[in-house]
Amino acid sequence: MKYGEKEIQEFDINAEENFWPNEHEKNYTINIELPEFMCLCPRSGYPDFAIMKLSYVPDKKVIELKALKLYINSFMYRHISHENSANEIFDALYSQLEPKSMKLIADFNPRGNVHTVIEIDSETF
C-alpha cells in the first residue's frame, strides 16, 4: 500500500486537528471547489465522478484544507449513492464546523444520460 492510500484509509474527519480556530469576527464566505470527487455506484460498482462545491460562513472553526481533501478522497472506493454521499459529507462537515451557514453542491458527471446535481443548504432547514 502506498503512503497516500494509507493516509486516506486511516483518515478520521472527526479528529480535532482537522479544524482550526476562526481568527476573524466578521462574516466572510469560504468557497471551496473539489473537482475530483469519486465514489462507486452501490448497485453496479461503476465509478461516479462529481465536482463538489462547498460554501460556508464560519463561526468558531474552519476546516484544514488537506483534511478536507483526504476526507473527500476517502469516498473513492465506497459503494454509495449520489444522495447519500452528498448528505454524509454535508452532515459530517456541518456537525464539526457548526458554521453560521453552509451549502454543498454535488454536481455528478452524467452517466447513462442522467445528470444529477444534489444541493444541500443550511438556510433551508
UniProtKB/Swiss-Prot annotation:
The keyword NADP applies. It catalyses: 7-aminomethyl-7-carbaguanine + 2 NADP(+) = 7-cyano-7-deazaguanine + 2 NADPH + 3 H(+). One of its GO terms (biological process) is tRNA modification. Pfam families: QueF (PF14489). One of its GO terms (molecular function) is preQ1 synthase activity. One of its GO terms (cellular component) is cytoplasm. Its main location: cytoplasm. It is found in: Cytoplasm. Keywords: Cytoplasm, NADP, Oxidoreductase, Queuosine biosynthesis. The active site is at 41 (thioimide intermediate), 48 (proton donor). It comes from the Bacteria. Pathway: tRNA modification; tRNA-queuosine biosynthesis. InterPro entries: GTP-CH-I_C/QueF, NADPH_dep_7-cyano-7-deazaG_red, QueF, QueF_type1. Transmembrane segments: none annotated. Substrate binds at residues 63-65, 82-83. Belongs to the GTP cyclohydrolase I family. QueF type 1 subfamily. Catalyzes the NADPH-dependent reduction of 7-cyano-7-deazaguanine (preQ0) to 7-aminomethyl-7-deazaguanine (preQ1). This is NADPH-dependent 7-cyano-7-deazaguanine reductase.
